[in-house]
A protein has these predicted regions:
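Short beta-strand/loop element within the Bergerat-fold HATPase_c
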Residues: 123-135
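Conserved glycine-rich
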Residues: 189-190
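Short alpha-helical segment of the dimerization/phosphotransfer core of two-component systems
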Residues: 35-43
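Short helix-loop "hinge" at the ATP-lid/N-box region of the Bergerat-fold HATPase_c
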Residues: 116-117
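Short conserved segment of the HATPase_c
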Residues: 148-162
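Short conserved segments within the C-terminal catalytic ATPase subdomain
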Residues: 81-90, 96
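Acidic ATP/Mg2+-coordinating residue in the GHKL
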Residues: 143
């Protein structure tokens, strides 16, 4: 994946230079440039996620993490996306802490909440709850979307799996978000 970063950066730079040097492009060329940008962004995101997944084991997991403020930060960060579709974000989080990687736990919760927003219905809601059950912190992210078919509930955590491949372009992403969620959870002694 590292070897892909440089050529991608060069392609992105050349595409930007082309667009700047040809401001009066005809509609067909402008459409092509836009399509190339979109695909380049998707490929860059894929490479970034693959690098993150390959480096998970080497990331320090010794941060003291206050989970309720972390959830609040994530909901604040995702508010603009939620507002686009009039999705309400709700939380009911106990004051719990854990030791782990703050950056990875942020990513885990972010990915779950972002999916709850993206795959929700218009005027829906996403609710995040955090409770202690025995000696375990239990995080739940629930939304008012159509849900995940029972036969896909295990597969969604496999890399590149999409429940509805026809919506991939519309939704963005490459099908690695929930695979990353599972890897992070397992790395921290948890499960999904």
């Amino acid at each position: 994946a590292h070897e892909l970063r440089t050529p991608l950066a060069i392609l992105q730079t050349k595409l930007e230079l082309f667009a700047e040097e040809h401001p009066a492009m005809d509609a067909e060329t402008a459409g092509l440039v836009s399509s190339l940008r979109e695909q380049l962004d998707r490929l860059t995101a894929l490479v970034r996620t693959l690098l993150e997944m390959s480096n998970l084991q080497s990331i320090s997991r010794t941060d003291q993490i206050a989970l309720a403020p972390l959830v609040e930060e994530i909901l604040t960060d995702l508010t603009p996306l939620a507002q686009k579709n009039n999705i309400s974000l709700q939380q009911d989080c106990a004051e719990l802490g854990m030791v782990g990687s703050d950056a990875l736990i942020y990513r885990l919760v972010f990915n779950l909440v972002e999916n709850g927003i993206k795959y929700n219905r218009l005027d829906g809601a996403v609710r995040v709850t955090l409770r202690r059950e025995k000696q375990t912190a239990v995080l739940r992210v629930a939304d008012t979307g159509p849900g995940i078919p029972a036969d896909c509930r295990e597969s969604i955590f496999q890399p590149f799996f999409r429940v509805d491949k026809s919506r991939s372009r519309e939704m963005g992403g490459v099908g690695l978000g929930l695979a990353l969620v599972r890897e992070i959870a397992v790395l921290h002694g948890g499960s999904v």
